[in-house]
Each structure stands twice: as structure tokens, then as C-alpha cells.
Amino acid sequence: MKKYTFYIIGLMALVFGSCANQESVTVEKNTEKPFFDVKGFFESEIAESKLTKIEKTVRINGESETQILTEFDLNKELSIFLNSDINKPSLFDKYNTFETEFSTTYKTTDKELNVQRIKIFKDKNGDFLKILINRKADTQIYTSDKALTYEPNVGYTIKNAQKVLLSDKKDYEIEVKFQ
């Protein structure tokens, strides 16, 4: 009988212990972003886009070619903007913020970072007007300076000055007008 009593007490402890009011622990991920959400902004622009065609002009060292495209992947077209996000925990202390009435600028002094500066322009109502992004890549093989400009419902421009080791400097510009 003592043997069964031990099992019954153990079973009751297990049943009542599992029914006890337990405090749940919630671990919240820090989703606050200290800088303008570049990636989220462009994901939203892509998702809400109703574009049916774009006019794309490519200029390389002064020569240009223009095409009207009705088949295009806006996600690929804007990928360089999507990849300019600075809201990563490892970058939180790498950028300084400068604000004026109509603009916010995020700038780094770290020459190793690809995104050197982001400047967002808004009108007096706080509506988004334009974003400028300066990217830099500097390796032993090449250097590249890119100036990106995006205007909602208007289009975007990518200007690049690139110098590859043992070759001439190459400038190119991509201008896309939304239609």
C-alpha cells in the first residue's frame, strides 16, 4: 500500500504542478529602428506600385541608349536602394543624424561602410519628396562611388564613377522615369 501511496502522491504533484498558474516569459525583439527604414520604404513602394512601363536610359562615358520597358521587375530595378538599409544593430553607432526642417541626413565617418550618406527630403506637410544615397566601395581592385536618387511617382537615377585597377575610369548613369 505504501508503494501505491508514493505513486499517487507523485501523480498528484505532477497533475497539480502542471495546472499551477505559471508566469509566462515574453522575450520581445527590439524592432525599433533608429534610422529611416530604407528597406521598408522601398518594399512598400514596390508592393503598392501600379507601374505598367518605365523609360530607362543608360549612359556610359557619354553615350546613351533609351528603352521603354513594359516587362520589368521593380524589385530588381530598386535592389540597390533596398540594399542600402542601415538599420542593422551592428550599424546603430556608425551613423550621425542631422535634421533640418525639411530633411534628415544620416552620415558616417567610417570609410569602410558601403553606405556613406542617406538624405531624406520631406515637404512642409511631412510628405516624402526624395531620397539621396551615397555608396562607396573601395578595394585593392576597384573603387566605386555611387549617387542614388529616388523620387516617388517620378523615377530614380543611379550615377556611378568606377575605376578598376589597370583600366580607365568608367562613368555610367541609369535614369528611370516611371510612366
Q: What is the predicted function of each stretch?
A:
Residues 107-179:
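Extracytoplasmic electrostatic interaction patches
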Residues 27-49:
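Post-signal peptide N-terminal segment of mature Sec-exported envelope proteins
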Residues 15-18:
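C-terminal motif of bacterial Sec signal peptides marking the signal peptidase cleavage site
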Residues 1-5:
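Positively charged n-region of N-terminal signal peptides that target proteins for export
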Residues 6-11:
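Sec-dependent N-terminal signal peptides
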Residues 45-124:
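Surface-exposed acidic loop/strand-edge motifs in secreted or periplasmic proteins
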Residues 20-23:
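Bacterial signal peptide processing site
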Residues 34-35, 73, 77, 171:
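Residue-level preference for alpha-helix termini and adjacent loops
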